[in-house]
Amino acid sequence: MSFLFFLVVLISIGLWVGPCVADNPENRCIKQFAKTNPACIVHCKYNLYKFTDDNYDITDQHINKFTDVLIKNKAVDGSKKSQVQEHLKKCAEESLKKTHGKNCQRLVEYYSCAVDNKLIDYFKYESAINSYDRSIYTPPYSG
């Protein structure tokens, strides 16, 4: 019985302390890149959100994740899912052409194209991403 109590206390402490020593993606990325390479903040966040990867790729899987987050957090209506996916796919292709390769600037271009205030409203996007960002905990940047 005392072992079970000890185990419950240990798990409770872990769940309580975990978020206290963790950071959300936006804060972590700002701490990591604000002084050295601000253009990489977007890539860092999108990588932690799983909207891209370490190699700056934007695959269908990444586009689907981005779309699902926007719909779940009410930035766009679910009935427009296929339109959003097509829009993001077009933005991924355009961002690669504009930046002549895979780099942090590609994700800045992708973001700028995606949040066009036509299909994806800036303020709804910000609200959705902020909600999603607060739901994710990452190890704090220790650089």
Swiss-Prot record:
Signal peptide interval: 1-22
- Which function does this protein serve? Inhibits the intrinsic blood coagulation pathway in the host by blocking activation of host coagulation factor XII (F12).
Q: Where in the cell is it found?
A: Secreted
Q: Which Gene Ontology terms describe the biological processes this protein takes part in?
A: suppression of blood coagulation in another organism
Gene Ontology cellular-component annotations: extracellular region
Q: Give the chief site where it resides.
A: secreted
What is this protein called in UniProt? Answer: Ayaconin
- Expression sites by tissue: Salivary gland.
Q: Which GO terms describe its molecular function?
A: odorant binding; toxin activity
Q: Which UniProt keywords apply?
A: Blood coagulation cascade inhibiting toxin, Hemostasis impairing toxin, Secreted, Signal, Toxin
Classify the source by domain of life: Eukaryota
- The UniProt record lists the keyword Ribonucleoprotein: no
The record describes its quaternary structure and partners as: Interacts with human F12 (inactive).
